[in-house]
C-alpha cells in the first residue's frame, strides 16, 4: 500500500519508520522545506527523533502533487492547531489524486475556537474523502524502535477498505483494532492530555502513588462523563483510545504533557514552559477548548476545571488539589 505521511515531528517520523519496516511504499513530507532538506541530507530527524536513522526505503518529499498522486492513504501527523492549514495545503494539490481512499489524522486535540475534533476539521476542508483517526497508547520512539504496541483506527464511510488499512498498518510490533466511534477515540486522545498535566502536577508535588491512582481513576470517570455528553460511546473510553492512552501518557517519563505538569507542580509558570518547549504541549490548548465546551453544555468536570484554573488563572497546583479533595462527598 502507498502511504503519504505529512508532518515530520516525532510521531510522523516514527510512524513512517514503522510503515517502512512493513515494506510499504511511504513518503514523509515535512511541512517546512528546510526540515525536509535537513532530514534528506542526514537521514535522521535530529530535531524531534534523534538517534533513529530513517531507512533508505523512505522517500522524502516536499512537493505535494506528485506524492498525493500515488497515495492510497494520507496520514496527517501535525498538531491539532495546525491541522486546518495543513488540510488547506493538501486540498490545493488533490486534483490528480485518483488513488486516495482515506485520510487519517494522528492529532490529539480540539481546534481552538471551533472546538472541532481532528476528523471534523479534515471533513470540513476535504469533504469528498473518507476520514479516520489513529490513536492509542504509543510513544513515538518506542514505535520507531519496533517495541510492541497496540492502537485503534476509527473511521466511517470506508467499507471494506478499513480492514485493508487495518491489515496494512498491523505487523509483528503493532496490532491495530478498528471502531466506528470516531468521536470517542478523538475525545479520549484529547482529554488524556489534560489529565496527564494533572498527573504531572501530582508528580511535581511529590504526592505519591496513592494520589496518582486516585487521580487516574477519577479522571477516567470524568473522561467517560464528558465524552458521552458530547456524543461518544462509553465503552470506547475503556479501550486503547481512552484508558490505554490515559495510563501511558499519565505515567510515561517521555510524556510532554505529564512533564509539563510536573514542572508546574514544582513551581514553574506555564508561559515560561511553553516558550521554552520545542514540541507542542497539546493539553494546554485542549484544556481551554474542553473547559469552554463543558461550560456551554453544563457538563460536570471538576478535574478539568482545576487544570484550567492552574493554566489560565495561575492557581497554584497545591490549591487545586485541596479544592478537589474538599468537594462535596458522594457515591462512586
Regions found by a protein language model. Give the residues of each.
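NAD(P)+-binding Rossmann beta1-loop-alpha1 motif at the extreme N-terminus of oxidoreductases
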Residues: 1-52, 59-62, 89
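Electropositive phosphate-/nucleotide-binding environments in soluble metabolic enzymes
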Residues: 9, 13, 33, 61, ...
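A short helix-to-beta-strand connector/capping loop
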Residues: 52-59, 99, 127-129, 172-174, ...
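Rossmann-like NAD(P)(H) cofactor-binding subdomain of soluble oxidoreductases
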Residues: 60-69, 73-148, 165-167
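Internal alpha-helical scaffold of NAD(P)-dependent oxidoreductase catalytic cores
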Residues: 82, 93, 121-131, 148-197, ...
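NAD(P)-dependent Rossmann-like dehydrogenase/reductase catalytic/cofactor-binding core
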Residues: 192, 199-203, 228-238, 242-332
Amino acid at each position: 500500500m502507498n502511504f503519504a505521511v505529512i508532518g515530520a515531528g516525532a510521531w510522523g517520523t516514527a510512524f513512517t519508520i514503522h510503515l517502512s519496516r512493513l515494506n510499504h511504499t511511504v513518503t514523509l513530507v515535512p511541512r517546512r522545506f528546510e526540515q525536509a532538506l535537513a532530514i534528506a541530507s542526514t537521514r535522521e530527524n535530529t530535531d524531534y527523533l534523534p538517534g533513529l536513522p530513517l531507512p533508505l526505503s523512505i522517500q522524502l518529499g516536499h512537493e505535494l502533487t506528485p506524492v498525493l498522486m500515488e497515495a492510497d492513504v494520507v496520514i496527517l501527523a501535525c498538531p491539532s492547531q495546525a491541522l486546518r492549514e495543513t488540510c488547506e495545503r493538501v486540498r490545493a494539490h488533490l486534483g490528480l489524486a485518483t488513488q486516495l481512499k482515506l485520510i487519517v489524522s494522528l492529532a490529539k486535540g480540539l481546534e481552538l475556537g471551533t472546538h472541532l475534533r481532528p476528523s471534523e476539521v479534515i471533513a470540513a476542508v476535504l469533504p469528498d474523502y473518507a476520514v479516520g483517526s489513529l490513536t492509542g497508547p504509543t510513544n513515538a520512539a518506542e514505535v520507531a524502535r519496533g517495541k510492541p504496541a497496540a492502537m485503534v483506527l476509527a473511521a466511517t464511510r470506508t467499507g471494506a477498505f478499513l480492514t485493508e488499512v487495518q491489515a496494512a498498518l498491523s505487523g509483528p510490533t503493532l496490532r491495530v483494532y478498528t471502531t466506528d466511534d470516531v468521536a470517542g477515540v478523538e475525545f479520549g486522545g484529547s482529554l488524556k492530555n489534560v489529565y496527564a498535566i494533572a498527573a504531572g502536577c501530582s508528580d511535581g508535588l511529590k504526592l505519591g502513588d496513592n494520589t496518582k491512582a486516585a487521580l487516574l481513576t477519577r479522571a477516567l470517570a470524568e473522561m467517560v462523563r464528558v465524552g458521552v455528553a458530547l456524543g461518544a460511546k462509553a465503552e470506547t473510553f475503556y479501550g486503547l483510545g481512552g484508558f490505554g492512552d490515559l495510563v501511558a501518557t499519565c505515567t510515561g517519563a517521555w510524556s510532554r504533557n505529564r512533564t509539563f505538569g510536573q514542572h508546574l507542580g514544582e513551581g514553574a509558570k506555564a508561559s515560561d514552559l511553553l516558550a521554552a518547549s520545542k514540541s507542542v504541549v497539546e493539553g494546554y490548548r485542549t484544556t481551554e477548548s474542553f473547559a469552554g465546551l463543558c461550560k456551554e453544555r453544563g457538563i460536570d468536570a471538576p478535574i478539568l476545571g482545576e487544570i484550567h484554573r492552574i493554566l489560565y488563572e495561575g492557581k497554584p497546583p497545591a490549591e487545586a488539589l485541596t479544592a478537589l479533595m474538599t468537594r462535596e462527598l458522594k457515591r462512586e
